[in-house]
């Protein structure tokens, strides 16, 4: 379930005083701390994303306080149009956030298969590990997503990768 706490024009959040968003996997997002490009990614607003990128192309890989890019947030939220826009603009696909999660790991963790496929087709490395030693395949297995696991293996995921446990 996704909760949204977007601010209205009067400065109040839609859900009262809540200023946190959660994606399907509990990816916590403090909306008030995000830059415009990150807000567009969370909302899935491809038109706003285009405007942000037109203003400053350097924003493509801008990091929030958790070292997440717009691509991380778009993948966690399942916004295929925004993910496609960002990868076509040549953003960094294998960039790590504070938990060493790549956008691919985040897409798989949130069970956003369409986003994961886009990343894989654009060269995302499926063998990178997060701080716990988990790869995207580990998260696909944890969520019992055989379809995602199959796609990861097809794109070269190492079936022998070990986590830190």
Curated annotation (Swiss-Prot):
<dbReference type="Pfam" id="PF12796">
    <property type="entry name" value="Ank_2"/>
</dbReference>
<dbReference type="InterPro" id="IPR036770">
    <property type="entry name" value="Ankyrin_rpt-contain_sf"/>
</dbReference>
<keyword id="KW-0677">Repeat</keyword>
<dbReference type="InterPro" id="IPR050657">
    <property type="entry name" value="Ankyrin_repeat_domain"/>
</dbReference>
<feature type="repeat" description="ANK 3">
    <location>
        <begin position="132"/>
        <end position="161"/>
    </location>
</feature>
<dbReference type="Pfam" id="PF00023">
    <property type="entry name" value="Ank"/>
</dbReference>
<feature type="repeat" description="ANK 1">
    <location>
        <begin position="66"/>
        <end position="95"/>
    </location>
</feature>
<dbReference type="InterPro" id="IPR002110">
    <property type="entry name" value="Ankyrin_rpt"/>
</dbReference>
<protein>
    <recommendedName>
        <fullName>Putative ankyrin repeat domain-containing protein 20A5</fullName>
    </recommendedName>
</protein>
<feature type="repeat" description="ANK 2">
    <location>
        <begin position="99"/>
        <end position="128"/>
    </location>
</feature>
<keyword id="KW-0040">ANK repeat</keyword>
